[in-house]
């Protein structure tokens, strides 16, 4: 049976190179569960805050930043206290709150895709940059779409790539990408990268223009009146 528990779960994400150290100070895991240090990618542990009588939690080694990170899951009634405990535990490491703008910038820098931007049901997984999630070799059983996906993998038409833009003007979702007069791609996401100190973007581009070092132009206004070199 499937049960909708959306209104019974709150989530706090703690991300960054010090996240493990912070959680290790705060989280109690029973002997039957993996510790924070033992958690592998995409795995979770059932645990509590501080001790056996503490707030019950699920902590997963997941996130959307490209960094070492974890997500802490609890009942909504405990969420404010869990937040306060995390902030207190992370004082020494400089833990600070961050919102969606920071999260979006980090995931673009890491090349992580967002539904509605990099894919929307009109692209196959290989065009969307998540071909690794398609078990063409590891799953022998047939599944819906397997044959066509095998064909698309062998004959890709487009590819998701990263662009470095020249100048201070940013690109945004939907901006067209050109080589000369021809449109060869579209910007799916863009931001000013704090790490690189330059504007960057994710772009779905025709396969023949997807090699690193290829020079293109991002079209603004109508795509022709104004261009940004990339």
Annotate the PLM regions:
Residues 1-230:
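Conserved, structured C-terminal
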């Amino acid at each position: 049976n499937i049960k909708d528990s959306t209104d019974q779960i709150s989530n706090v994400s703690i991300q960054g190179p010090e996240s493990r150290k912070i959680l290790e100070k705060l989280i109690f895991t029973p002997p039957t569960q993996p510790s924070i240090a033992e958690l592998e990618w995409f795995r979770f542990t059932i645990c509590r805050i501080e001790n056996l009588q503490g707030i019950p939690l699920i902590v997963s080694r997941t996130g959307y930043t490209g960094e070492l990170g974890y997500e802490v899951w609890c009942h909504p009634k405990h969420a404010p206290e869990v937040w306060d405990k995390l902030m207190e535990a992370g004082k020494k490491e400089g833990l600070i709150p961050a919102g969606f703008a920071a999260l979006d910038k980090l995931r673009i820098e890491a090349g992580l895709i967002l539904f509605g931007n990099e894919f929307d049901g009109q692209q196959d997984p290989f065009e969307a940059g998540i071909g690794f999630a398609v078990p063409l070799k590891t799953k022998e059983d047939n599944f819906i779409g397997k044959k066509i996906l095998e064909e698309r993998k062998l004959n890709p038409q487009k590819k998701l790539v990263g662009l470095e833009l020249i100048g201070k003007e940013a690109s945004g979702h939907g901006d067209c990408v050109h080589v000369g007069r021809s449109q060869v791609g579209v910007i799916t996401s863009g931001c000013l990268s704090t790490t690189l100190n330059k504007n960057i973007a994710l772009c779905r581009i025709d396969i023949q223009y997807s090699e690193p070092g290829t020079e293109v132009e991002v079209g603004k206004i109508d795509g022709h009146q104004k261009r940004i070199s990339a």
